Amino acid sequence: MERIYSYIAAITVCLLLGVSCGKDNPPEPQQQHTAAVEELILLMEANPTVKSLLEKSISQAAAVNPDRRYNPAQSLYEFYEFVDWNIRQLPWEVMITASPTQYGQSLYGRTDQGVGYFWFIVDQPLDELRDRGYYYPTVEFVEPFSSWLTTYASSWGEWLSTAESWNSSYYSIVASDPDWGLSNGWYEDASNWHSFNDFFSRKLSSPSARPIADASVVAPADSWPKELWRIGEDNQLVFPSDLQIKTAKLSDIGALIGEGSAYREAFAGGTLTHTFLDVNDYHRYHAPVSGTLRELRNIPGVAAGGGYTMWDDESKLYYYSNDMGFQMIETRSCAIIETEEFGLVAMMPVGMSQICSCNWLPSLKVADHIEKGKEMGYFLFGGSDIVMIFQKGVEVTLLHDGDHLLMGQAYAKLGKS
């Protein structure tokens, strides 16, 4: 706790005096830093080019948002200090100052901003990285910093799974906020939650909390459903002409399905859709269709933001822009389900932002028959995405209007084309 109070005090003094808290010579990694930051310091000292890119990203972020109330990490040393602070906080406590807007003051808004600020720092587009094949020309995709982001995400996730991350007052905060749905009678008894991640991956009280619709495809999770994307005969996503994505790996369905799968080419000419889970959603995922489980895999990827983060000075909020394609590089899982009438369906939970944990239930086994709506796994803290892919010859008609769906509600009708 001493480091936390020191961080608050230091930032407060800087704000009062209107000066930078930066230091020209950050200390050697010792006990004053967390293990994650010690690792980062060593990586930066061993890789001066990447260190320079990170420093430029931090500086560029400070030029975009110089307001220290909302952007306290404006030097490399301050970035180290911020990460030390960040990975020992609940998501809604990460940002000391909240936006004055109604959204920014809400628990959901503070959580959203607590997740997004880190990515704003490392999401800055850098000229040196343009046209070099990165998803975005940002330092978050440059090694070894890119790999360290997994350390950062894992370190925060580990703390969020400790008893220190949960108590009765934290429960009261979320229980009193309707955005989290705890007053609806949907979930298991709160006495089962002994950490923030226990709460975040909470179970339903009974199957009746999420009735399963009589539709070909149901929502695999509480989520915001998106549109359909066509897959070409070359197994590449077909992008609208106004969507500029230049690297082939961001459209390759085989790459999305992952190395080592027997089904990398099975969806050429088919259709893809995806649905986004927000941070306050129920974060367990269920089978969208009935059928036989033919493959069950985990696919390692990067711990990236799932898009890029920008700053709106008027509202004092960070906001996100994500194009289809980020799923190709994120940590994800893949289940191949063979249906009786409509061939193979791929269901792919995708970790986003500080989420790098997609977890299948241990009871799932290849060759099992699974019923539509059966629980299959869960995410730990953050926002996330679920991709569903259908084969050539299957006509997919969406049954939603883009509004939020609960798991089990009608998502799509399937037919033969």
Predicted regions and their residues:
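Bacterial Sec-dependent N-terminal signal peptides
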Residues: E2-R3, G18-T34
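Bacterial N-terminal signal peptides
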Residues: A9-G18
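Contiguous, well-folded functional domains in the mature portion of proteins
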Residues: P29-S417
